[in-house]
Amino acid sequence: TALAGCSNHEGESTAPKSELNVMSYNIRYANASDKGDAAWDARKEASVTMIHDVKPDVIGMQEPRFSQAQYLIGELTEYEHYYLAPDDKDSQHRNAVWWRKDRFEMLAQGYFFLNEKDITQPIKGWGHNQFRTALWVKLRERSTGKEFFFFNTHLAHRASPVEGGDIDQVARTESVKLIVEQMKQIAGRYAPIFVTGDMNASYAAGDGRRTCLDGFFEFMWSARETAPDGEADDVYSYN
């Protein structure tokens, strides 16, 4: 999922628009139990080929383990990256942002945890069984001097109903609210902002899970809806 905007209300910039090719990519963490075509060793060359073919300007990536990140660093030499590894385990709770180093320079970076207690600590939020994170970078386009913020996240997924509702839906909804609050504090209300992520929520109209993204849609525009015709699709693939 990719969303973008300054704000969904007043304050829209009148500056000339620049094109930005953005990719959100859950790479599927390298799991020893994945066999055959699902194994990372079977997928890694195709992953690099796909990125080289699509040529995204910025990538929001979810789940790259250390070994995967090291491989990609060696192969994606045209990109710089910010790789978030907030624990000392080689877990799937790792996110990254990649950007074309010939086009952009990074001005700032940071991250926070998605929970209701202390966003500086790896606390499991809203009764969930895993901690989740969001990371961000501030980039400047070298040719124009334009600056923007890019956030990337991976929202809750467990599919465990609890009394009073789905704990996943609660965690996703509250996480989105928190991310939007942090966007406003870090970037301000009218700075250009992009957010990508594995939202673990359906985009389909009428699907109740979509409501957890309301906080994003109230603050931003959907890049899917504003993309040129034919450049956004609903094709599923295996990482």
Predicted feature locations:
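Loop/turn elements at helix/coil->beta-strand transitions in domains of secreted/extracellular proteins
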Residues: 17-21, 54-58, 77-81, 144-149, ...
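Acidic/histidine-rich helix-loop elements
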Residues: 24-45, 114-129, 156-171
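Sec-exported extracytoplasmic/periplasmic mature domains
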Residues: 52-56, 69, 73-78, 103, ...
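Structured beta-strand-rich core segments of catalytic domains in phosphoester-bond hydrolases
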Residues: 58-155
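N-terminal, active-site-proximal structural segment of metallo-dependent hydrolase catalytic domains
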Residues: 3-75, 87-93, 177
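Active-site environment of divalent metal-dependent phosphoester hydrolases
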Residues: 29-31, 64-69, 157-161, 200-210, ...
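Active site of divalent-metal-dependent phosphoester/diester hydrolases
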Residues: 81-100, 116-119, 125-131, 190-193, ...
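His/acidic metal-ligating clusters that form di-metal
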Residues: 133-153, 165-209
